[in-house]
Amino acid sequence: MAMNIRKIHPLLKIMNQTLIDLPAPSNISIWWNFGSLLGLCLVIQIVTGLFLAMHYTADITMAFSSVTHICRDVNYGWLIRNIHANGASLFFVCIYFHIARGLYYGSYLYKETWNIGVILLFLLMATAFVGYVLPWGQMSFWGATVITNLLSAFPYIGDTLVQWIWGGFSVDNATLTRFFAFHFLLPFLITALMIIHILFLHETGSNNPMGLNSDMDKISFHPYFIYKDALGFLSLLILLGILALFLPNLLGDTENFIPANPLVTPPHIKPEWYFLFAYAILRSIPNKLGGVLALLFSILILMLVPFLHTSKQRSSTFRPLTQVFFWILVANMLVLTWIGGQPVEQPFILIGQIASISYFSLFLIAIPLAGWWENKILGLN
């Protein structure tokens, strides 16, 4: 009997081992859907982005007009743009759920997979930031000015670094051109890293809600998880359709409908909603360099999580105290997101400072202590 071609063909064999005959734990829940949803988001963003790039002009005199032209004159240009803009929001929703799943169920103990995931988050944030500058509206321009100017806080090299990124002495045409180049390039770098992320994951196999070894209880990825992922795909596409068709500007900033004007500062400069938690941490520290470092460590702290794991159990499923701290962390993130969108005045300054201290304390002190205490209670030392 002839061997199935998908099992012997050099290229199809790799696809088969990744998507068809992959042994997967039988008990993984819906929280394991977000990895494949991130892949779908990436494909949607690359395809819509490619079509937008065909009509976009990276020049400060024409960028805003070219986006208007896409929405008014290009066939279904309005739809492509709305899908691309709201697809970015859903990308971040999926990645935040994906990270939260990893934190809750102890997936971070696969260190290589986890660290590449953190690098992917950095790249995704960089891509979204440079992409937000491209329409060249008021918030695009001032957001780019404020965020890039933070680099000047670094001693000695700061000012030179900022001018190097700007390509001059202010955010200008050179800045827009290079940001467009970066925005085009980075998604392909993300794709490459995503493949490496999956490669490392398949070295160890997937984690599961129990946090136990599931080698004795695995099922093939196809058809079981293909259908389960298909349900997630359908749900995401319906949500994206509702956003793009009915509420396209819900998550955007109205300031960005005004063309960029270096002489008029918007009343409140703020990034897109998915950066607000980090922006709140940045603003909560009065010192410029301190704020920049806090902003950086708000993401880099994820790389420390595997080393701060003190519990003898991997997952939080049977650890009630850790669960409490996890949900406090989630609530804390939501508070930071809210504060990031508020003006810099009392009581928002104080709430932001308390939430920022809580954010780092939960990662560095509360959750490791909870793990240690649970070991004591259960006599697992």
Curated annotation (Swiss-Prot):
InterPro entries: Cyt_b/b6_C (IPR005798), Cyt_b/b6_C_sf (IPR036150), Cyt_b/b6_N (IPR005797), Cytb/b6-like_sf (IPR027387), Cytochrome_b (IPR030689), Cytochrome_b_C_euk/bac (IPR048260), Cytochrome_b_N_euk/bac (IPR048259), Di-haem_cyt_TM (IPR016174). Disulfide bonds: none annotated. GO terms for molecular function: metal ion binding; ubiquinol-cytochrome-c reductase activity. Heme b b562 binds at H84, H183. It is a multi-pass membrane protein. Keywords: Electron transport, Heme, Iron, Membrane, Metal-binding, Mitochondrion, Mitochondrion inner membrane, Respiratory chain, Transmembrane, Transmembrane helix, Transport, Ubiquinone. The keyword Transmembrane helix applies. Belongs to the cytochrome b family. This is Cytochrome b. It comes from Carcharodon carcharias (Great white shark). The gene is mt-cyb.
